[in-house]
Amino acid sequence: MIHTQMEDAQYEIRHQVLNPNQRQQLEDRRRIKEQLHQLEQDNESPTHMYRRKLKIASDVNLLDQHDSFYHTTKSLLVLFQIMGVMPIMRSPKGVDMPRTTFTWCSKAFLWAYFIYACETVIVLVVARERINKFISTSDKRFDEVIYNIIFMSIMVPHFLLPVASWRNGSEVAKFKNMWTDFQYKYLIVTGKPIVFPKLYPITWTLCIVSWSLSLVIILSQYYLQPDFQFCHTFAYYHIIAMLNGFCSLWFVNCTAFGTASKAFAKELTDVLATERPAAKLTEYRHLWVDLSHMMQQLGKAYSNMYGIYCLVIFFTTIIATYGSLSEIIEHGATYKEVGLFVIVFYCMSLLFIICNEAHHASKRVGLNFQERLLNVNLTAVDKATQKEVEMFLVAIDKNPPTMNLDGYANINRGLITSNISFMATYLVVLMQFKLTLLRQSAKNAFISALKANLSRIRSLDADKVNT
């Protein structure tokens, strides 16, 4: 009966001009007809037509086979395991369990306990020697206090590693598994795998650069700082390499997001060019939401580590900048100030790389997709496609692809500008304090010289009276 009424209505519509309300009614009838036809084809509950499937059935062997992200970035994961920074493990092939796991009693974690204990002994010995040397020295000037604080602050990430990194191991494993699942879903939906052709050489290069740069920076401090002993350098190599490794990890993930979004955007453009792409757009919208949630999970998984990372960079940059400027004002430029400027440049470079890469990744996943969807000519597509495009845009608005440190801060270019403004404020205060000390020293020196001259004049006058 319903089919007969629809056919009669369509016959009548051919012979009249439709107003907008009639056209909307016609589209609704056509959509109902398609849904009824689909229900006749299967006996499932109608909820499957509007509710997203909770999980795509997958085989662990297929997950391993198509996990290009893991295979291309495996070297960085192994480096983190060797350094004891993030002891997560990859599940053996064929084992029906999450592909990346985290447990407190795994082999990787036992090794992390051991290597961390050895490194802690070295760091504590060097820290004790630095503290004892500072206490025993007679020079207690404010500048010397600042100078000693710089190299003590660099040790802070080591002591906070268990709290900042290990404690979030389960979230990191979840993030890795999200990448694995996303690649398989992408293959199912688009029919094409995601390929990361540049990540393999980039990851290997960054692994080597992380340790090479650590050696260069610490040895430069040994040669440029007058009281930096060679034995003290061994307490800093692994710390700087760890900071470099986390920066490399962030760069690799942001690059992967950019590569995935570029391939995804191309597939979206091809789908929009087809006839009646509404059903496919629904799957693409769900896939995009997964990609956005992955970016949010990256910030959540490493929130503590990168939060401390940014604080250490902020604090060390301020102290090193002040120390170098105050020494130049008081004593002139020396090799010591060059060493401090090396630290400042290094810290600001790390912050710039992290913020800039996060900005580009968010733009590629969010803004680029919005522009493609907004450029769709809605008058040239059917009503169902129009609604899907609108829902896609709403999904982008409600799930912004931002990298947020678990609610503490958004990682983007705005973080650089805010940090620089805060640094400038604190530096102005510290330099005012320094100039006040210099004025007081000059005033005291002038008074002392004046008193000495007066006493000498009085002694000369007394000698004249006696003669």
Swiss-Prot record:
InterPro entries: 7TM_chemorcpt (IPR013604). GO terms for biological process: response to carbon dioxide; sensory perception of smell; sensory perception of taste; signal transduction. It is found in: Cell membrane. Glycans are attached at N453. It is a multi-pass membrane protein. Residues 1-106, 166-198, 260-304, 359-414 are cytoplasmic. Its main location: membrane. One of its GO terms (cellular component) is axon. Carbon dioxide-responsive neurons coexpress GPRgr22 and GPRgr24 in the maxillary palp at both larval and adult life stages. Keywords: Behavior, Cell membrane, Glycoprotein, Membrane, Olfaction, Receptor, Sensory transduction, Transducer, Transmembrane, Transmembrane helix. The chain crosses the membrane at residues 107-127, 145-165, 199-219, 239-259, 305-325, 338-358, 415-435. GO terms for molecular function: olfactory receptor activity; taste receptor activity. It holds the Pfam family 7tm_7. The keyword RNA-binding does not apply. Residues 128-144, 220-238, 326-337, 436-467 are extracellular. Gustatory receptor which mediates acceptance or avoidance behavior, depending on its substrates. GPRgr22 and GPRgr24 together are sufficient for olfactory carbon dioxide-chemosensation. Belongs to the insect chemoreceptor superfamily. Gustatory receptor (GR) family. Gr21a subfamily. This is Gustatory and odorant receptor 22. It comes from Anopheles gambiae. The gene is GPRgr22.
